[in-house]
Amino acid sequence: MKLTCVLIVAVLILTACQVIAADEATNRATKRGCLMCWGSNVRCCEKANACVSINYECPKARR
């Protein structure tokens, strides 16, 4: 009985850690959109996390 409870708690903790890690990876990928946006003729569209030419409008925000 005690072993079963320990195993259930361990599985719950590991599942929570995986969810947190996946969420963090998603946030890093989202923020990466403007990371390489540098130069004299480009700009960062923060809402869409995109780097575009200064001659173009920002794309709509990603969901």
UniProtKB/Swiss-Prot annotation:
Keywords of this entry: Disulfide bond, Knottin, Neurotoxin, Secreted, Signal, Toxin
Any Gene Ontology CC annotation: extracellular region
GTP-binding keyword on record: no
Keyword Iron: no
Signal peptide extent: 1-22
Paired cysteines (S-S): 34-45, 37-51, 44-58
Top-level taxon of origin: Eukaryota
Molecular function, one GO term: toxin activity
Entry note about domains: The cysteine framework is VI/VII (C-C-CC-C-C). The presence of a 'disulfide through disulfide knot' structurally defines this protein as a knottin.
Function of the molecule: Probable neurotoxin.
Record protein name field: Conotoxin Cal6.28
